[in-house]
Structure formats: C-alpha cells, structure tokens
Amino acid sequence: MTDPATDTTRRNVHDHEVAKFDAAASRWWDPQGECKPLHDINPLRLDYVAQCLGGLEGRRILDVGCGGGLLAEGMARRGAEVTGIDMSKAALQVARLHALEMEVEVAYRQITVEELADSDEPRFDAVTCLEMLEHVPDPASAVHACARLVKPGGHVIFSTLNRNPKSYLFAILGAEYLLQLLPKGTHDWQQFIRPSELDRWAREADLVLRSMKGLTYNPLNQRYKLTDDTSVNYLAHYQHSPARAGS
C-alpha cells in the first residue's frame, strides 16, 4: 500500500526538488552555508510581512514551503501562532528540532498546500508562501490553495523570481555560478514567474494586490534591500477580496 506521506505522483510536487531540500536540510541553520542567502534576506522578509499585516502579535499564520523554519520561527518569535508546511521530511525534522532547542512554538506538518486547503483546517489570518512557487509544477494551483486558506479579508504574501533575461543573468549565472551564493541547480529559470502571471492567478482566486516590492543584492557590500525594481526577486502582498465574506 502506498504511503500517503510519500506518494507524490498526484500531488503538486517535484520529487527532485524535494530531494534537493532533503539533502540540504542538515545545513539549513548554518548562516555561512548554502542557505546563507535565506539567512541574509530573512530580516527583510520578516519586516515586510509584519508591515503588510500591521504586526504579527496574535496573528494565526500559515507558512507554505517552510523548509527548515527560518521564517516560521521568526514570525513565532514576534508573537504569531505559526503553522509551517513542507514536503521535505528532512527539512521538517530540522525545523522541529531547532524550534525545540530555541524554545519556540511552531506546528510543522508534511502536507501540500492543496491538501491542507481541502481539509477542515480553520482558516488563517495570513498565508506566507516565500521562495516556493518556482519549485512546484503547478504554481497557479498553489496560489489558489493559499487563497482558500485565508479568512475573508485575510492576507497572502508571495515571493518568487521574475522570468526574463536579467533574472537569468543575475539569479542563475550570477548567483549560482559566478558569485556561488547558491548551489548550482538550485533554480530552473523556466520555472520563474512573471509578476503578471502571478497577478493573473491571484485575481482568479479573488486576491487583490496591495503592494509589490523587489529584492536586490549588492555584491560589493553583500547586502540585500527592498526596492521598486521587481525585475529579478520580488515580494507581493495580496488581500482576499472582502466580497468573499458575503459569499
């Protein structure tokens, strides 16, 4: 009998992507290791999420594609009630252990966002889905599932990479080959998502765009910052249409 926790044949999952994150799981919390870019951008991501939500204290938040728990733990430390989901069993094991060691409470589950949306899980105040959409075969499905998991008027925050020649130059050639910020093969440029594509899927799911910001990296000072340039990395804040409350 097939184990439902490992059967990905009919799920919105790339097995090879899960395998990559399984292999990197033990080094997830090493700020100087292959996950260094995530450590470097995490304060910016946390501040952006907090700003979009008007604070995290008391918010019930779902972190989709939580990996080893960098963002999930950060939100929990700021007072949010956080659930993190991922399909990498190894990454979740690391996330649980780190949260236990740091005495931070986060609920972690191995489940796809679509499966959670189909369950009787109570709706969340907000859903974060950062650096995840470019790693699944059907990102539109994930966007729709995220929208189904928030309360009427709830917030959904995405981050991903734009698909254009500049993003290939910076995110693939630059980040993976020249600067070696990420392991080679971390990203597939064909899986990158134009803001117009993300916005179309979001609008189909009754999500209204509230803000969009770019995330740029300066190799000279090795720092990231939020800008209005969305040509490579970008974050997008959506709110579920209040019309849903009456539906």
Swiss-Prot record:
One of its GO terms (biological process) is methylation. InterPro entries: SAM-dependent_MTases_sf (IPR029063), UbiG_MeTrfase (IPR010233). SUPFAM superfamilies: S-adenosyl-L-methionine-dependent methyltransferases (SSF53335). GO terms for molecular function: 2-polyprenyl-6-hydroxyphenol methylase activity; 3-demethylubiquinol 3-O-methyltransferase activity; polyprenyldihydroxybenzoate methyltransferase activity. Keywords: Methyltransferase, S-adenosyl-L-methionine, Transferase, Ubiquinone biosynthesis. O-methyltransferase that catalyzes the 2 O-methylation steps in the ubiquinone biosynthetic pathway. NCBIfam families: UbiG (TIGR01983). This is Ubiquinone biosynthesis O-methyltransferase. It comes from Alkalilimnicola ehrlichii (strain ATCC BAA-1101 / DSM 17681 / MLHE-1). The lineage of its organism: Bacteria, Pseudomonadati, Pseudomonadota, Gammaproteobacteria, Chromatiales.
